[in-house]
Amino acid sequence: MNSNEIENFIYLNNTLLSEVPEPNSVFYTPKCFSNSKLPHQSDLEEPSSACSLSKNTIIDGGADEPYDSSDSCATFEFADFFKDNLDDFALDGPIININHVNQTSPYTHHNAEPLHDLQTFSSNLNHSNNRRQTICNFNMANDASKENETPYMVLNNKFNPVLTTEYTQQHLVQCKMVLENHITSRFPHFYTKLPDVSLVPNNMPHYPDEVTAKSAPKDDFYVPRFTRGHGISKLGLCPICSHQGEFIWLRTKTSAYWYHMNFVHGIHSKGRPYQPPIEFRTVRLRKTRNAIGVPNKKYMIEGKCHQCNKWIRCQGRKDVSVKIPEIFWWRHAHRCHIITTDLR
C-alpha cells in the first residue's frame, strides 16, 4: 500500500468518525434494527445498492449536505416502528415511569377528589393498556370525619395487596397474633397513658410551709412542678402520682426522687419515658442446685430491647409477687437506652 492509498484510507476513516449522519440517512429501513449481519458484509463496506445513499451524504459529511428526497429509500417513521414492534407502548403524552403511573393527591378539602378513584401501579410488569387499574380500594365516605382515618393493610394474596378501612376476620386474626407477641398484660405500666403534668392536680391539699410552683416544658414528665423546703430538705411532688390522686413528696437532693421516677414510673431524668420491649417470649429456666428458701420459677418472660437487640429478663428468678414488675426492664433501659429530647 503506497502513501496515497494510506492517506485516502485515513481521510475516509476520519470523515466517518467525526461526522454524525442524520437519522433519516442511517435508519433508512426497518431492517437496520435487526441484529443479524450477513457473513460476506464487512464493517467498511457500503450499503447495498438496492437502498443506497448518495456519496456526498456519507463521505462529505452527511449533516452538511442536503438530503436527496428523490432517493428510492423513503424516510423511516419511528412511531410506526414502535407501534408495530413494542407491545402496549404508549406514544402519546409525556414519558411515564412504571413506578409512578397515574398518581393523584389524596382527598382534602381543597382538592375534593374521592379516595376510591385513587389510582396506583400494579406490580405485574405485563400490564395492559388499561391504565385505570384500581389496586387500592378505599371504601370510605367522602366526609371530613373520616378524612384522616388510617387504612389497614389486608393481604388477600401476596400479589394483590388491598388497602381498606374495614375490619376483616383475617385482619383481626393477624392483630391478635401480633398482640400476643408484642403486648402482654403482665406489665401494665408499659402501656399506661401519662397525664398532662402541666395542669394543676385536682384537690391538692394545703401545707403549712410554702409551696413553690416551677415551670417546665409540657412534655417533660420528670421535673417536679411543686417543691417545698430548701437545701437538703427540699422536697418535690411527683407529677404523675399527683394526677392519680396520690400526693407523694420526695427529696430531690438525694436519690429518692430520681429512684422513684426511674423505677416506679419509668421516666428518665431527661423527661422521656423508657421504651418498652418490642417483643416478648417465654423461656424455660434451668434447674439450680442447692436452692434455698423460695423456689425458682420454671419459666421466665423475656423482652427484646430495640437498642441492643438482646433478650432481657423481665422477671425475677424467685417465684414471688412483685409490687412493680416493670422494674427489671427499667433497670436495663436506664443502662442501655439512649434518651433524646429532640422529637423531630
From Swiss-Prot:
Keywords: Meiosis, Nucleus. The keyword Signal does not apply. Its main location: nucleus. It is found in: Nucleus. GO terms for biological process: meiotic cell cycle. GO terms for cellular component: nucleus. InterPro entries: Rua1_C. PANTHER family: MEIOTIC EXPRESSION UP-REGULATED PROTEIN 26. This is Meiotic expression up-regulated protein 26. It comes from Schizosaccharomyces pombe (strain 972 / ATCC 24843) (Fission yeast). The gene is meu26.
